[in-house]
Amino acid sequence: MSSLLAFHAHPDDESVSTGVTLAKYADEGNRVVVATATDGSAGEIHNYDNPEELFPKLAEMRRKELEASLEALGVKEYEWMGFKYSGMMGTSENDDPDCFWRQNYFDPVGKLVDIIRKYKPDALITYDPFGGYGHPDHIQTHRIGTAAFFAASDLDKFPLKDSQEVWIPKRLYYSAWSKKRMQSRRQQMFDAGIISEEEFNRFNPIGSEHDDIDVEVDGTKYVEHKIKSMKAHRSQFKDDWWGFNIPDEFKEDFLGYENYILAFNRGSWSSETDLI
């Protein structure tokens, strides 16, 4: 049995960025673990009539949503790191000294090192240096995840605790969106009248160059798992969101493939379709 650890910024990122990947490897009998850095406590609230009353409980709500999401994906183990949500780039939340964006590296890296030593993953997934789309928490997750990948074997800075053992993950992956694939998908959806011009342009031209992608996981078998997982994050996705109503002829192509950049490889591993 192989093991995979996905380190994400917010509750719901595990679904959006890696949903079919996690479902696939869990279903195939591998140990799959999700570590979520922040509590999502400053996110939007959809589908509720009283969002102002719910904001004080948002972190608790989002943790429960995460648990339901992971159940939909078949993931049985997770770690809630509980750092404070940092808000979008350029907002006042970025200046909060308690937010994840403002944390010194040592504390969050140390927490993730403990998680790596606990679960002993063969591969670690996090984000690229831009964090996918420039969110402060995603950028910080990239930094912390990359640092912890190497720090897990650094006994000088991170001595072993209790019954811990040194663990060195074999591979580090950055979750990525192929710019070429995203543009093609959006164009198809726009031409079919499924998404608006605003949605079409929303993330354009975010993504990685297609030639930089090392692995494309085919999770078409698990598309419905991913949709159910995203729907579990009810406070974050409107019930009528177009992503829940993709016609069958587009659904597998749009949601069933997830891309990764192999950032570091200890050994001779080479695959264009498999992470572990």
Where do the protein language model's features map onto the residues?
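Metal-dependent de-N-acetylase/amidase catalytic core
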Residues: 1-5, 93-98, 102-276
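Active-site rim/loop-helix segments in enzyme catalytic domains that contact anionic ligands
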Residues: 1-119, 147, 154, 261-264, ...
